[in-house]
Amino acid sequence: MSRWIQRWFFSTNHKDIGTLYLIFGAFSGLLGASISLLMRIELSHPGNQVLIGNHQLYNVLVTAHGLLILFFMVIPTLMGGFGNWFVPLIIGAPDMAFPRLNNISFWLMPPSLILLLASAFVETGAGTGWTLYPPLSSVQAHSGGAVDLAIFSLHISGISSILGASNFIATIFNIRNPGQNLYRIPLFVWSVLVTAFIILLTFPVLAGAITILLTDRNFNTSFFDSSGGGDPVLFQHLFWFFGHPEVYILVLPAFGIISQVVSTFSRKPVFGYVGIIYALISIRILGSMVWAHHMFTIGMDVDTRAYFTAASLLIAVPTGIKVFSWIATMWKGSISLKTPMLFAIGFIILFTVGGLTGLVVANSGLDISLHDTYYVVAHFHYVLSIGALFGIFAGFYYWIGKICGKQYSETLGQIHFWITFIGVNLTFFPMHFLGLAGIPRRIPDYPDAYEGWNIVSTYGAKVSIIGTILFFYVVYLAFTNGLISEPNPWSLRRERLDSSSRTTEWLIASPPIYHTFNEIPVIKET
């Protein structure tokens, strides 16, 4: 067997598996972004543009876009890619706790992706949205195998995530550096740890919900079928008990990356380290107690709505602690506006905008009007499309030199930031106005009155795609004729222990040798 196949297909090395995850995430992200551009072109003007009036096909695109970005781009990139690459390096571990489990965690993802893509080509595809609500996902409304394939895809992806999460928990608790207690590990490791616990506790609930849906579709049960004594709202409760923590699974590792980046480029330790840790844990706990704010329109009684409104508004407190801690870290720091820092600042500004619209839709009275309008789309894309994505870009530009030993072009990186920043704002900010005007989501046509802001939004999507193409060009240039990266490219003074070197990965070579720590290094306070 060739050494290449041995290395990449049977790898047990956390760096190689991290690289595979990053490549997989980039591929899935391109697919998801292409689908979103197709949807925006369809919505650029009233009437039929590219989908010849096929509303089912439009909903298949919505479903594929959501699932691709959430399960196949963001989680594999942030947890699988950056998590695998840097958690062992930062905590001084020789590898992950279970290297072969790590391998199967990755190799479950491509079959899962294939099943999801296959579902779009079976009969009319799965036009349910990523939420898979019955009765739309029931056998009466989607009679073919498409929804079943999507369910199997989510099962396999969920198994992968659960295995990966248990691996991270075992690694961080058991093969951490002897000198690093839990209050000394960097915030990126903390964010991965908290995220792993969320995955471990919520993915099994999703698995249960979609398994029951599978039996409803194929084995004549009626858990979600009201004609047989079931309740479709039960699915919504089960799904959102997973689905709301899921959005924190997506954004918490990005929080960790932003904490590291802001600290490095402000030349200061992060402000309120312990406060940020407790904010992370609070978000994790509160995030599992607010799921029904996605369901204000199903006819809950007023006491239930009052509780879920109050609990949802309460999440703003730990989130605010994190945002103000990042701002305080930058306050009076010696700020260096390199590309990762630009993405971090962009993240803080735009995530705050998304958080503010979140405060609006958390109010049950208002949400009755705003539910399933473009206002909600604008809200969660500001948090996810801008939050998680900017976190990924910040992490990539921050660590690319460590991953491949080559540095990117700073000029092109900054141009990429500005194109992306302008593009995503042009895309999603007008959606607030459309939502307030009452345009519903998941519908490919609309009255003429809404055309103006839709044109602006589609223009923004095209700008964002140009930014994405530029990003891949930046990566191509870095790999082909990039500058050789030093062990710590962000150091002001050419010393090993500059103020920016607060984590272990900057003390080793770029790229690191295949087996970085043959024996666990000892870290001591000086």
Swiss-Prot record:
Name recorded for this polypeptide: Cytochrome c oxidase subunit 1
Keywords: Calcium, Copper, Electron transport, Heme, Iron, Magnesium, Membrane, Metal-binding, Mitochondrion, Mitochondrion inner membrane, Respiratory chain, Translocase, Transmembrane, Transmembrane helix, Transport
PANTHER family: CYTOCHROME C OXIDASE SUBUNIT 1
Cysteine pairs bridged by disulfides in the record: none
Gene name per UniProt: COX1
Location relative to the cell: Mitochondrion inner membrane
One Gene Ontology molecular-function label: cytochrome-c oxidase activity
Domain of life: Eukaryota
Family statement: Belongs to the heme-copper respiratory oxidase family.
Annotated metabolic or biological route of this protein: Energy metabolism; oxidative phosphorylation
Pfam families, alphabetized: COX1
Binding site for O2: 248
GO term, biological process aspect, one: electron transport coupled proton transport
TM helices/strands, residue ranges: 17-37, 67-87, 104-124, 149-169, 187-207, 238-258, 270-290, 308-328, 341-361, 380-400, 417-437, 464-484
Ligand binding (Cu cation): 244, 293-294
Binding site for Ca(2+): 42, 47, 444
Entry GO terms, CC: mitochondrial inner membrane; respiratory chain complex IV
EC number(s) on file: 7.1.1.9
Free-text comment on the cofactor: Binds 2 heme A groups non-covalently per subunit. Binds a copper B center.
Function: Component of the cytochrome c oxidase, the last enzyme in the mitochondrial electron transport chain which drives oxidative phosphorylation. The respiratory chain contains 3 multisubunit complexes succinate dehydrogenase (complex II, CII), ubiquinol-cytochrome c oxidoreductase (cytochrome b-c1 complex, complex III, CIII) and cytochrome c oxidase (complex IV, CIV), that cooperate to transfer electrons derived from NADH and succinate to molecular oxygen, creating an electrochemical gradient over the inner membrane that drives transmembrane transport and the ATP synthase.
Binding site for heme a3: 379
Organism name: Cyanidium caldarium (Red alga)
Quaternary structure, from the entry: Component of the cytochrome c oxidase (complex IV, CIV), a multisubunit enzyme composed of a catalytic core of 3 subunits and several supernumerary subunits. The complex exists as a monomer or a dimer and forms supercomplexes (SCs) in the inner mitochondrial membrane with ubiquinol-cytochrome c oxidoreductase (cytochrome b-c1 complex, complex III, CIII).
Positions annotated to bind Mg(2+): 371-372
Membrane protein topology class: Multi-pass membrane protein
